[in-house]
Amino acid sequence: MSSSSSSSAVFPLDHLAAPSPTEQLCYVHCNCCDTILAVGVPCSSLFKTVTVRCGHCANLLSVNLRGLLLPAPAPAPANQLHFGPSLLSPTSPHGLLDEVAFQTPSLLMEQAASASLSSITGRSSSSCASNAPAMQMPPAKPVQQEPELPKNAPASANRPPEKRQRVPSAYNRFIKDEIQRIKAGNPDISHREAFSAAAKNWAHFPHIHFGLMPDQGFKKTFKPQDGSEDILLKDSLYAAAAAAAAAAANMGVTPF
């Protein structure tokens, strides 16, 4: 029990005949050809679901008239348009024209496009968020290990070369002992004067260089620069000099 009629997206309402008192005029939107259909529904079927055939594209539409008459809290299907009570009344054609101008198909298409764009944006943002940790973490670089030294390596390998200690010569030993002997006999003498006197004693005793024995020694006087009394050389001097000469001979020192 349904009737259908087709019209263009914008149609004059003057050509529409006023419905009979036993029918209710309803307007249904065809989502296939984007056409608004004016349907006359009997009053006995206002709260039923009727089938409407589009006169423009012959598409069958299932229309719930209860949703058209009473606004429901849930959103209506895409193929139905909600009109106020003034639109359902056949005596207010101008109000219907105003509502149709606002509820154009282009507005519906924009709403659908915005919904699809928001869903695509949400999916892309979630995929970017899931890929963000992988992009932020750079690949780990291999750690270069330094070659380990063997544990049993000798410690002397890293030790700097030691300086070889030279054995003091017979001359150095004689000068050292002679300076100590001169300072013991004359404590007031300076180190420079004692060294000069020790060097003169070494030069004035050629028998020391030849390694003569202490029993062949002789006495010699020494006159210091400060005019002090002559110091008599003792037998201990010859013994020390002889020992120094013997050590020098053992080291291969040639006599003068």
Curated annotation (Swiss-Prot):
Span list, region Disordered: 127-168
Domain of life: Eukaryota
Gene3D superfamilies to which the protein is assigned, alphabetical: High mobility group box domain
Subcellular location: Nucleus
GO annotation, cellular component aspect: nucleus
Pfam annotation, one family: YABBY_N
GO BP: abaxial cell fate specification; cell fate commitment; fruit development; polarity specification of adaxial/abaxial axis; regulation of leaf development; regulation of shoot apical meristem development
Tissues in which the protein is found: Preferentially expressed in immature organs containing meristems and organ primordia. Expressed in phloem of developing vascular tissues of young seedling shoots. Expressed in the phloem of midvein vasculature of young leaves. Does not show polar expression pattern in leaf primordia.
Keyword set, alphabetical order: Differentiation, Metal-binding, Nucleus, Zinc, Zinc-finger
GO-annotated molecular function: zinc ion binding
Keyword Aminoacyl-tRNA synthetase in annotation: no
Reported function: Seems to be associated with phloem cell differentiation.
Protein name according to UniProt: Protein YABBY 4
Species this protein is from: Oryza sativa subsp. japonica (Rice)
Lineage of source species: Eukaryota, Viridiplantae, Streptophyta, Embryophyta, Tracheophyta
This protein's encoding gene: YAB4
